[in-house]
Amino acid sequence: MKKVYILLPLLFLIYWSCEDTKEEEPIYTFVKTFGANGGDIGRSVQQTADGGYIITGKAGCGVDGGGVWLLKTNSQGIEEWSNLLTNAYGCNNGDGEGRWIQQTTDGGYVIVGTAFPDFYDEYHDYPRTILLIKTDSQGQVEWKQNFGGIDYGLFDDSEGRFVQQTDDGGFILTGYTYSTKNHTNDVWLIKTDANGNEEWNRTLGDSIYFQWNAGGDEEPMPYALNDRGSSVQQTSDGGYIIGGYSTGWCFDSDWRITCKSNVLLIKTDSRGDREWLKSFGESKAGEFHRGHSVQITPDGGYIIAGERAIGNEASNFWLIKTDINGNQIWDKTYGNGGER
């Protein structure tokens, strides 16, 4: 049986210094589990203005069905209330999943995730859509919006990964969508007003066909990149910075599947038009680099958290620091024996 776990006070803790340090065991303030249906998943947590915590994710299939789950606790992790925000199709695919949550300026919450249609199947023959939900302070739904799907193009499969409230009271969200132009996934950036109505959307990235083989040399073999947005922040100039990654699949001369993956950092203006794109990680088949979160640093640059792996080795935590123009200043790898 799967349950949602919340471990506080820290989700991730990184130590680095010029001196050797002894690894210390974490001290937990509390550990709580929520859910009893099986298949319950916690995806995002944020501390709220009252010192408690708000969690979103996916509820498994139980008496009330499944779907996007919202749960509020006090400062000690004791549940205050929980709401199932989507349950249109009962237990069929769980109906949806929350991927990121933020408390809004009015004390309510905004959740972005993915909605599954009632006819969705494991082969993705029918499209998922990005789901945006706004609730009041008690988790009662005020409105829902969907982006993507057949209205945007047949078999347009989309997934929402991150949302942030913008300075004008609206929302900026990112994830990915299937591009009918390139026949690959593109980073999708969507701007809405305060009621979730779309103001504009942009597909970003470099989803083009390449020539590559398993040894890293150019060969006349098919190759395509799939770009995905993982995180977005509004910048001081009114534009946006998006962190994510680009993955690719190809076949070598013996028709063996090979692949690669790079971290992406994309800067746009206030209308979502791309100003620049930076890629991090060596562009060789068999190397994996993924960006999962980006933050703006006090010096105006950016810090990216992600993962990297080469060949068959396990992935390691990867931290990249850039200047305001996305040029790498330094990077650090943690795991499998410490900092490198």
In which residue ranges do the predicted regions lie?
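A sequence-level/structural motif corresponding to short, flexible coil/turn segments enriched
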Residues: C18-R340
